[in-house]
Amino acid sequence: MAVARRVAGTYTGNPSIAALAVAGSVGAGLADRFSDLELDCYWVRPPTDADRLRPVKAVDGSLLALWDYDHDDEEWSEDYHLGELGVTVSNFLTGTIERFLDQVVEQADTDPVKHMRLAALQRSCPLLGAELMTSWRSRAGGYPDELVSAMVERALNPQVLGSWAAREALVARGDDLAVQALLSGIGYAVVGSVLALNRVYLPHTRLKWQRHLIAGLEVVPGRLTERLELLSAARHTEALQAAEALLTDIVLLAEARTGADLGPFREELSGRRRAIGPPPG
């Protein structure tokens, strides 16, 4: 965190910087020996190359990349090294964050890019513009019922179970990669729906820090962590049985607590391709 404060100090003289926060595992207090430093900068106007390069030079960093504006993520970013420490800076406009908050909290927008940004607001450590960050966090905390239902439906999409009906055939044929892909998709669906039920924004599409992410959640099926581990650690037949039981519990929990329409998912979950007998000799 000392390095982060040193870097943050190089931005203080720029009147266009509205807020700066330490993000990622460092900002969340989860840093380990694999962690890089991630900084989120919020600007009142588009940052120039000079705005972005000045802090790198001020701390004698070694620039690796100065990325152009990414229209999908709505950010500029740069990567550099401070000695052996990797630093990634993500730059956003304050107007973009205000719009994301409006779209997600007021319009139940399920876009993962927007949800990851709101999750970052909640999990980061502000070093500049703390008052603005606090106001954003307050707005992000208003996770409405409509958004819960929408996110549950997004997580429990029937497409997650695209090869579910053929699961026994996949096992019998030794299609290990296909079974693993199916189980992995189910794991993501389970965690995504549980996060929604607990009104928690998805912090990363790859669900980094999985155990920490689901620890302490209140609205969960019994033995969630243990049952998720079975999806990857158990033999395929056992793992698929565990997946079916877990998904059934998740659907019951979601239907009891939300207005999500899970009929199509239920129908897909009940599917099973039956063997019709031995092949002709």
For each feature predicted by the language model, list its residue ranges.
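Helical scaffold of the NTase/Pol beta-like nucleotidyltransferase catalytic core
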Residues: 1-21
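Conserved NTP/Mg2+-binding pocket subregion across the NTase superfamily
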Residues: 58-173
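Catalytic metal-binding acidic patch
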Residues: 22-60, 72, 80-91
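Short secondary-structure capping/turn segments at boundaries of alpha-helices and beta-strands
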Residues: 6-8, 24-28, 65-66, 75-77
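Alpha-helix boundary recognition
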Residues: 12-13, 35, 172
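Conserved nucleotidyltransferase catalytic core and NTase-mimicking acidic/glycine-rich helix/loop elements
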Residues: 135-281
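Short, solvent-exposed loop/turn segments at secondary-structure junctions
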Residues: 27-28, 94-95, 201-202
